[in-house]
């Protein structure tokens, strides 16, 4: 009985260990494509579900994942480059618009100041003859300190100065044809350059604008 059992046990075929072959074309550790190796016909040809051989090698899921990951990284790099270029263009546009706006503000403020000075100049031009009369009265001693007339004159002068109207032209200063009008030239010994010898009519400035030039007598070298 025992011999029969032994005989039956010896007739069973020995079980073969399964052979595992890594057919992935891309090395999962390095990410590089593997070089083709010399394989037997059985290893080169895969049998399809219906038993028919397929000449094309099918990529495994791991290979597809690696390829997909590489494609995604390349796409992300391309998208990032495009985003950086777009950001640089938008920044350049913003800088250009900012510069244009700054220049516009400067022009506007400059024009506004010019118009302001022009408007004030038109208003105070009518007061300049009054200021001339006050100056003559002061020269002749008619503005007695403490009198009502002197008080009014002081207030008027202070008001026009607050508006920015300032007198100019003094005896002894260099003659400048841009701001002085020479009504007479007087040869003077010892004078080496044209100099204001006397101020006949005071000049007035409003900011950078000359409202009226000063009329002067010029001392010239003899």
UniProtKB/Swiss-Prot annotation:
Region named Disordered: 1-64
SUPFAM superfamilies the record matches: Coiled-coil domain of nucleotide exchange factor GrpE (SSF58014), Head domain of nucleotide exchange factor GrpE (SSF51064)
Basic and acidic residues composition-biased segments: 16-44
One Pfam assignment: GrpE
Predominant location: cytoplasm
Cellular compartments annotated: Cytoplasm
A single BP term in Gene Ontology: protein folding
Chaperone found in the keyword field: yes
GO CC terms of this entry: cytoplasm
Subunit structure: Homodimer.
Family: Belongs to the GrpE family.
Official protein name in the record: Protein GrpE
Source organism of this protein record: Leifsonia xyli subsp. xyli (strain CTCB07)
Gene: grpE
């Amino acid at each position: 009985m025992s011999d029969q059992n032994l005989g039956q046990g010896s007739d069973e075929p020995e079980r073969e260990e399964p052979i595992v072959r890594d057919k992935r074309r891309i090395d999962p550790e390095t990410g590089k494509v593997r070089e083709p190796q010399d394989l037997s016909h059985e290893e080169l040809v895969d049998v399809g579900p219906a038993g028919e051989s397929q000449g094309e090698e099918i990529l495994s899921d791991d290979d597809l994942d690696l390829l997909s990951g590489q494609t995604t990284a390349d796409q992300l790099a391309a998208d990032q480059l495009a985003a950086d270029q777009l950001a640089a263009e938008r920044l350049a546009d913003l800088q250009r618009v900012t510069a244009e706006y700054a220049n516009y503000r400067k022009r506007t403020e400059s024009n506004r100041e010019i118009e302001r000075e022009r408007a004030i100049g038109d208003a105070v031009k009518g007061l300049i003859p009054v200021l001339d009369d006050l100056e003559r009265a002061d020269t002749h001693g008619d503005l007695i300190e403490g009198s009502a007339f002197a008080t009014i004159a002081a207030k008027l002068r202070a008001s026009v100065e607050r508006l920015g109207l300032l007198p100019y032209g003094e005896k002894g200063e260099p003659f400048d044809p841009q701001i002085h009008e020479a009504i007479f030239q007087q040869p003077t010994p010892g004078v080496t350059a044209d100099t204001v010898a006397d101020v006949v009519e005071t000049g007035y400035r409003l900011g950078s604008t000359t409202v009226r030039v000063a009329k002067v007598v010029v001392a010239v070298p003899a």
